[in-house]
C-alpha cells in the first residue's frame, strides 16, 4: 500500500527499518531514468522498488518526510531545497547539479492572514486542514472532519513553496510568491507563474502534491551523462 498521511506513518516498522507493505508515495522522485529514493524510514525501500521497476537505476537520499515538500527539481541540473537539506545531501544523488538552499521557506506572502496560528491549533484537526476558527468552533470541526472523512491531506505543506510544478525547463507553477524561491528561479532563467488555489489545504498542500498524478509526454532520459 502507498500512504500519504502523517498519522499513518506508524505503519512503518521502525524497529527493523524494513519495508513491509506500506510506504509514502512522496518517498520516490523520478529524474529521467533514475529514481531518487528516500530510505530514512525504510532501509530496503530502494532494493524493493528497483526489483519491481528494473528499467530504472536508483540513488538513495535521507529526507524522512514528503520529498516534494523539501526539494524541487525545476529543470535538469538544478535543485531548490529547504534549509534542512544542503549540497552534501545531493553530491552522490544528483552529482554536478547546482543546489540552491532556501533559508527562510516559511516567510512568504500567503494572502490568507496569519498562517502561523495554525501551528498552535493543528492538534485540533490533527494537521489535516487549517482554519482560524477551528480552535473555537467544535461544530465546524466536526462538519469538516465528517466531510473529509476519506481525505488524507496535511496542511503543513501549505506554508512553504518549494512544492511546485515544473511545466518545462523555462516555466514553473507555484501557489505563492516567496522571495528567495522567486529570485533563485529568475537567476536560473526560469519564469515562475503564481496560481492561487483557494482550497489547497483541503487537497494536500503544494501544487506538486495537487498534481502528483500528472502524466508527462516523452521518453525516459539520462540527465547525468
Describe each PLM feature range.
Residues 1-225:
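The feature marks the mature, well-folded catalytic cores of soluble enzymes
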Amino acid at each position: 500500500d502507498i500512504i500519504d498521511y502523517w498519522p499513518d506513518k506508524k505503519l512503518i516498522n521502525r524497529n527493523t527499518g524494513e519495508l513491509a507493505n506500506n510506504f509514502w508515495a512522496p518517498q520516490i522522485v523520478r529524474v529521467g531514468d533514475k529514481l531518487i529514493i528516500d530510505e530514512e524510514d525504510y532501509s530496503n525501500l530502494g532494493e524493493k522498488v528497483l526489483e519491481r521497476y528494473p528499467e530504472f537505476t536508483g540513488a538513495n537520499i535521507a529526507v524522512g518526510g514528503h520529498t516534494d515538500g523539501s526539494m524541487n527539481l525545476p529543470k535538469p541540473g538544478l535543485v531548490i531545497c529547504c534549509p534542512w537539506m544542503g549540497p552534501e545531501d545531493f553530491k552522490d544523488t544528483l552529482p554536478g547539479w547546482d543546489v540552491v538552499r532556501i533559508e527562510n521557506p516559511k516567510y512568504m506572502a500567503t494572502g490568507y492572514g496569519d498562517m502561523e496560528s495554525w501551528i498552535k491549533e493543528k492538534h485540533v484537526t490533527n494537521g489535516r486542514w487549517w482554519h482560524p476558527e477551528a480552535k473555537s468552533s467544535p461544530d465546524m470541526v466536526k462538519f469538516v472532519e465528517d466531510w473529509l472523512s476519506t481525505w488524507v491531506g496535511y496542511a503543513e505543506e501549505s506554508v512553504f513553496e518549494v512544492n511546485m510544478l515544473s511545466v518545462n525547463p523555462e516555466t514553473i507553477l507555484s501557489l505563492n510568491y516567496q522571495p528567495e524561491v522567486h529570485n533563485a528561479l529568475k537567476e536560473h532563467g526560469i519564469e515562475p507563474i503564481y496560481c492561487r488555489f483557494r482550497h489547497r489545504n483541503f487537497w494536500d498542500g503544494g501544487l506538486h502534491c495537487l498534481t502528483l498524478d500528472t502524466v508527462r509526454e516523452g521518453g525516459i532520459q539520462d540527465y547525468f551523462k
